[in-house]
């Protein structure tokens, strides 16, 4: 019935045709007892398709926390200090221990240095830092925006040969006049 004329006979006659067909089929499947529950749970009754199995994830809040250290979990400071290898909690809590470093002033200069704790760092003096040298011949500090290039000591001095000569003759380029170069800081003589 690919021809449009064949379809028109159904519309013009206003006839309705009902077709009934019966198909008998037999399917034999063998499954184990463990497979039937997973296959049946994955079948969707609406579509009859097999869906992915639901993935059950365990929640961390339901699980008992695992302690990797042999410390008392009620004393958080001791647990952190054992994990990081810091000083014992007794050095911070009690005042009878002597350390080489003290935040309070003492009248006896040898009171804090008689014992040195094994956890203290050995500080060594450093050489003073020198400022980095500039690897370039020109820097932004040497450039005068009106003239183009200037001397570091006198920013209003024009270097001959950059835009031409100082008087503006020769060189092919246009150079600002010497009046503009010397008055570069005033707002009335700026180039617009």
Curated annotation (Swiss-Prot):
- Comp. bias intervals (Low complexity): 24-38, 102-114, 175-192
**Disordered as annotated region, ranges:** 24-65, 101-135, 163-192
Cite the Pfam families for this sequence: VQ
Composition-biased stretches, type Basic residues, lie in 52-62
Disulphide bridges:
none
What keywords sit in the KW lines? Nucleus
The question of whether Repeat is a record keyword is answered with: no
Q: What does this protein do?
A: May function as positive regulator of plant growth.
Protein name as catalogued: VQ motif-containing protein 22
Species this protein is from = Arabidopsis thaliana
């Amino acid at each position: 019935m690919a021809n449009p004329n064949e379809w028109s006979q159904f519309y013009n006659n206003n006839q309705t045709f009902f077709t009934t067909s019966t198909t008998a089929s037999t399917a034999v499947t063998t499954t184990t007892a463990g497979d039937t529950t997973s296959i049946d749970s994955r079948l969707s009754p609406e579509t009859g398709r097999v869906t992915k199995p639901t993935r059950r994830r365990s929640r961390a809040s339901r699980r008992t926390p695992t302690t990797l250290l042999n410390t008392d979990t009620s004393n958080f400071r001791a647990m952190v200090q054992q994990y990081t290898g810091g000083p014992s909690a007794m050095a911070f809590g009690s005042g009878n221990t002597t350390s080489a470093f003290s935040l309070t002033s003492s009248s006896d200069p040898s009171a804090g240095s008689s014992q040195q704790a094994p956890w203290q760092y050995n500080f060594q003096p450093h050489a003073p830092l020198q400022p980095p040298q500039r690897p370039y011949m020109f820097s932004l500090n040497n450039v005068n925006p009106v003239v183009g290039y200037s001397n570091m000591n006198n920013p209003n001095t024009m270097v001959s040969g950059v835009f031409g000569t100082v008087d503006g003759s020769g060189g092919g380029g246009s150079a600002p006049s010497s009046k503009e170069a010397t008055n570069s800081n005033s707002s009335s003589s700026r180039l617009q």
